[in-house]
Amino acid sequence: MKYVLGIDLGTSGTKTVLFDQYGTAVCSALVEYPLYQPHNGWAEQKPEDWYHAAVDTIRSVLTKSGVDKKDVVSMGISGQMHGLVMLDEAGNVLRPSIIWCDQRTAAECDQIHEIVGRDQLISITANPALTGFTLSKLLWVRNHEPEVYAKCRHILLPKDYVRYMLTGDFATEVSDASGMQMLDVPNRCWSEKLLNMLNIDPSLLAKVYESCEVTGHISKAAAELTGLSEDTLVVGGAGDNAAAAVGTGVVEDGRAFTTIGTSGVVFAHTDKLAIDPKGRVHTFCCAVPGAWHVMGVTQAAGLSLKWFRDNFCMAEKEAAALMGEDPYNLMNKQAAQSPIGANKLLYAPYLMGERTPHLDADCRGMFFGLSAMHTRRDLLRAVMEGVTYSLKDCLNVLAEMGVAPETMLACGGGGKSPLWRQMLADVFQMPVATTVNTEGPALGVAILAGVGAGLYASVPEACRAMIHVNPAQNPIVENVPQYEKVYALYTKLYQANKGLFKELAKL
């Protein structure tokens, strides 16, 4: 039996899963780490935390599984996208990584549009300048920390920093590189034109691979730390959403998935390049060679529920600890006791600004309609419904582009909740299913690793062999019109408060 490793480098922690060649999860391990917010709207993490988490989880799964290291033929890494890792000439980290949800770079986005032109930028990178993307973060460092920028010799994404530490190779791949906003997305290579216009040295950037291509193998030092063999191959891997697409089998036209992780995503595969001229959704290279994907992103999906849990659900956390249960299960039970519409309470999930469809770094979250009658269960349901409505916003933009999914899969932590899946089915008005294996991104990069090692001839072939789908939850007919009424009001909240968000940001 051959085995493949999938490493999922997330915002809250890194999870490593060992799979056999048929897609069965043998063993997994998780290590969490903090997120730092030194100022309002800022978000940073320490790259060293990611690396140590990867080493610890790899060693843990190999030890617990008892699998011979020589049978682990390959591995792939999935990573939170857009984070900026800057290394000096010796490969040392120069500063904490500015990660995907950081919102400090509005001025740099304006600078990019002024120099390049918004339309030309979209034609090259398939996206407008956004605060979440790597390019604006790089310019922020150049503008505000010139001494750090002057020492920089390598720019990497989060997962690619871990790859470098495990292999010694400076490499990236097309799906994650698409989110740096320096890639020519239609042609799947770095844009020399864009880099020249912005005076960025191309030598700072790593070599670009396709996601299932082999980029190197485990170094001797990393083999000693992790317990892996030096013969273990490492493939390109993928950005977290592209990895989730592979891990849920969304690798052909007509297929889509919704992720409720820290962020929320509605993601659809397309064999033909499709770009939204308004820049409301993101078009990136897909982990399937020669294909692309279109995705709408909401900044604070699972993050909204985690924020509520950490600040208002201490009793549930304590009870769950005593019962040996996940506190989210107790929170779901409470939310289910509140009716659709949460007793006329709405929640806008703009805790970290918003991407799709508003592209507004200044908007902020709110409860609308709060009264003395409301209970914690109403607030919990409002949070879950508000996130669902924000995902509906994403789906609507895809529909405008002519991308109409026929099947929808749910993944991420929120996708494990039957209540949340039913909300998605009722609001999206389509069946929502899950895969038997819920390790979406980790399975996705493990599949890519299997293709890279020659266990399978192509990504679609590997998906057909390794992925199985559970029965879907269908829309409940009587629920649909109730959600439609609430959603209609939800869509007015942003426009009604857009000006106030700007005023708030100036305080």
Where are these regions (language model features)?
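N-terminal glycine/serine-rich phosphate-binding loop of ATP-dependent small-molecule kinases
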Residues: 1-95, 123, 151, 220-224, ...
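Active-site core segments that coordinate phosphate-bearing ligands/cofactors
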Residues: 5-6, 21, 106, 113-130, ...
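Structural signal for short hydrophobic segments within the conserved structured cores
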Residues: 27-31, 206, 471
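Flexible, glycine- and charge-enriched loops at secondary-structure boundaries
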Residues: 43-51, 98, 321-324, 384
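Short, conserved phosphate/pyrophosphate- and ester-handling motifs at nucleotide-, phospho-/glycolipid
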Residues: 46, 102, 240
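Short beta-strand-loop/turn "lid" adjacent to the catalytic site in phosphate-handling enzymes
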Residues: 63-100, 128-134, 163-184, 207-210, ...
